[in-house]
Amino acid sequence: MNSKYTSITKFGEITNEDAAIAKDNIIAVSDGAGGGGVFADRWSRYLVNNLPEYPITNYDSFDKWVDGIWEQFYNACEEEAKKTGGLLLNKFYDEGSFATLAAAWRLPENKCRWISYGDSVVFCYNRNAKELHHSFTRLCDFNNPPYLINCKDPLEENGFRTGVFDISDDSVIFATSDALAHYIIMTYDATNVYRDTQFEVDLGEDVHAKARNSNYAIGAFGFINKDFEKVVLRKLFSGLKNKSNLERHLKSLWEKQLLGLDDYTIAIMGDQK
């Protein structure tokens, strides 16, 4: 399989504020936050398209990278906002642009470095062990406001996460925006509740949070004893070959109250060459 990505716009909307890249040894997803600021879709595209080819390994290097790219974006958007003036310009000056970021780089010696800022998520699934690892914290934390990269304001070190996955020929590395990430982690928890109590606890916390994702988590109990790879991952991965089929599948999940309404983006890293 080659590296590839696809993105589905929120049902009923025109603008997709997600962005992604998928290269041989790097994938990334960014979710532009349209609830605050302006130019969110451009900022998310700008972030993924300006990622370095070599991995970011710690907060200081992440901060240095953002510090080295934000000004060009800011100046270009400022000039455009000035043409409109008024509320748009004031909003840009006051709030700027916001986005999350999740990225992964393939390393030598069967390693993969990942970083995240916000609630976009990098995953590593081992097809032989049937195990899923990811860059996020707990399922119920999707209910919290995410950390966001702003085009003009300082970063918060607490928002940055990084780590390394051990990978093999059986590993699949992929990244998604938050609504899809919640669905994936939620259903993995449900299919593994009898294997380890930690999955039952994680899913139960989301149910009892009485937040926007709790109804989805309740529905996830229908996945108990199901084959996670078959009923969840394969359907998502096959959608990378046929966007229309993926859109129909995601709309069905949304109608069944298993998936939040959002832009949906997935990027997958190709097999080792």
Please give the residue ranges for each predicted region.
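Short helix/loop capping segments that flank catalytic or ligand/cofactor-binding pockets
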Residues: 37-38, 124-125, 183-185
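Catalytic core of PPM/PP2C metal-dependent serine/threonine phosphatase domains
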Residues: 60-125, 158-168, 250-261, 269
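N-terminal entry segment of metal-dependent catalytic domains or homologous docking segments
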Residues: 1-55, 120, 153-164, 260-267
